[in-house]
């Protein structure tokens, strides 16, 4: 898997751990081994501008997901499709505030947002109650497996 991580946020970021987490999630979701993912960490003004431009929402957000080739999780008996999974844009400053509020710190929040974003890239959503249960249940499972290894 090709995982590119760019940190333009001014906030320290454990790039190796983030790449390992991304690889772990993509493996668990049976994404093709040659799939590509780019994660970019940005500051609040940058993510606020992207949020306004692409989501038509004012203000900063924690993570934005931009799928490319509409890859989906692989099935047990099928070969997954090759392609570009897409781009994630994270804001560590927003993650720091959310992590503090949740009581688990910035790094844990960035991990959560990374898993959340990858699931969005794979077509998961949480607009409807059933989708919310499925996506957040899977997110919790993946994070628990990552932290238990």
Swiss-Prot record:
Family affiliation: Belongs to the endoribonuclease YbeY family.
UniProt-listed Pfam families: YbeY
Name by which UniProt lists this protein: Endoribonuclease YbeY
Single GO BP term: rRNA processing
Cofactors required: Zn(2+)
Biological source species: Nocardioides sp. (strain ATCC BAA-499 / JS614)
Protein purpose: Single strand-specific metallo-endoribonuclease involved in late-stage 70S ribosome quality control and in maturation of the 3' terminus of the 16S rRNA.
GO cellular component, as recorded: cytoplasm
GO molecular function, one term: zinc ion binding
Binding positions for Zn(2+) per the UniProt entry: 116, 120, 126
EC number per UniProt: 3.1.-.-
Keywords: Cytoplasm, Endonuclease, Hydrolase, Metal-binding, Nuclease, Ribosome biogenesis, rRNA processing, Zinc
UniProt-annotated location(s): Cytoplasm
Cofactor note: Binds 1 zinc ion.
Cross-referenced PANTHER family: ENDORIBONUCLEASE YBEY, CHLOROPLASTIC (PTHR46986:SF1)
Domain of life assignment: Bacteria
């Amino acid at each position: 898997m090709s995982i590119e991580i760019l940190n333009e946020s001014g906030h320290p970021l454990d790039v190796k751990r983030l790449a390992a987490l991304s690889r772990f999630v993509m493996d668990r979701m049976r994404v093709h081994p040659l799939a590509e993912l780019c994660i970019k960490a940005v500051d609040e003004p940058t993510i606020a501008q992207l949020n306004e431009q692409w989501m038509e929402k004012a203000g900063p957000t924690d993570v934005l997901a931009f799928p490319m080739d509409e890859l989906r999780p692989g099935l047990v008996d099928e070969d997954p499709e090759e392609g570009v999974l897409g781009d994630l844009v994270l804001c560590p400053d927003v993650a720091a505030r959310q992590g503090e509020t949740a009581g688990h710190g910035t790094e844990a929040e960035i991990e959560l947002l990374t898993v959340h974003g990858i699931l969005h890239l794979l077509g998961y959503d949480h607009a409807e109650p059933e989708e919310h249960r499925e996506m957040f249940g899977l997110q919790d499972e993946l994070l628990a497996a990552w932290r238990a290894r």
